[in-house]
């Protein structure tokens, strides 16, 4: 087992995002049981707030773009909306249980 030199943010959809997704997309329905997405961040951080502030726009846009390319349907990309649309948990330990390498695009 290998230790990956990254921390992580686990980003889970809250009701406003779920409602937005379900209004955009007929192919699948999102609900509160939908698994969170994990974003790798710097390994050593002491205060979560600056990490979220420096990454929330990229994360918010990634979550929106995964559902729709219609930018006119997007909410304002700001911290207030991010906190209303997603819950975030952070951690500093990432372990790779696989033998093969990790591919990144």
Q: Language-model segments: which ranges?
A:
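Amphipathic protein-protein interaction modules
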Residues: 42-104
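Extended, charge-biased low-complexity segments
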Residues: 1-44
């Amino acid at each position: 087992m290998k230790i990956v030199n990254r921390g992580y943010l686990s980003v889970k959809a809250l009701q406003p995002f779920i409602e937005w997704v379900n209004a955009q997309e007929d192919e699948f329905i999102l609900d509160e049981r939908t698994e969170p997405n994990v974003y790798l961040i710097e390994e050593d951080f002491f205060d979560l707030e600056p990490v979220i502030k420096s990454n929330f726009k990229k994360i918010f846009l990634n979550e929106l773009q995964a559902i729709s390319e219609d930018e006119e349907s997007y909410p304002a990309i700001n911290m207030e909306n991010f906190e209303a649309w997603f819950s975030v948990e952070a951690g500093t330990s990432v372990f790779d249980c696989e033998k093969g390498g990790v591919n990144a695009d």
